[in-house]
Amino acid sequence: MDFQELKHTLYSAVISDTLDSMGYLNQVLSSGIRPLDDSMILCGLARVGIYMKIYHDDEKVNVYEHEIALIDSLQPNEVAVLLCHQHHEIAPWGELLSTRSQYLEAAGCLTDGSVRDVKRIRQMKFPVFAGNIGPLDSKHRGKLMWYDVPGKIHGVNVNSGDFIFGDVDGVVIVPQQITAEVVEKALQKVREENQVRGMLENGVSLAKAFEEHGIL
């Protein structure tokens, strides 16, 4: 897939509509997860990491071990999907992880936890979608226990290799096994919507445009 082309051509609504038409009705995350900037677009393949809330931190234990391993292993166009079970006191993402990920040409980060260093990340224009913003470190509060294992975010199943697309409207997760079909159909729907838009701009009635294309 040409992720740069998809990033500039697709949008979350058309992917959601495509999934609906195929019978996948629960692939959109709730509105609680937002981009750090409305212009950010998340487009890539998931790498899932699962955090566990902790109540005691032994200084002899490296709580960052698996987190570092996951981030350092990111490939171009991959999205770090960090699952904190909506514990907003866990902030798994910040400026330094963004810096490393951007160097690796990763596509961004998606988390239901918190993110910090927001000012710097916005300046970097690195796509980050998060459930909350806060200054807390994940140390003493959470630890990444597993990665590249099945997970769930806001009730939506997610696996490493799934296609992640997010924009100002929301985030959609496309299962890996249907990604190629969904992308093809979504691109076709974009072309059809462009035709309908042109018709409406030239005075064609909404009823006529819908009758001809079935798109609204």
Kindly give the residue locations of the regions a language model identified.
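Acidic and generally charged, gly/proline-rich low-complexity regions
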Residues: F163-G166
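Channel- or pocket-lining gating/hinge segments that regulate access to a cavity or pore
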Residues: G170-V172
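Feature captures the catalytic cores and cofactor-binding loops of soluble hydro-lyases/lyases
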Residues: M1-S160, V174-L216
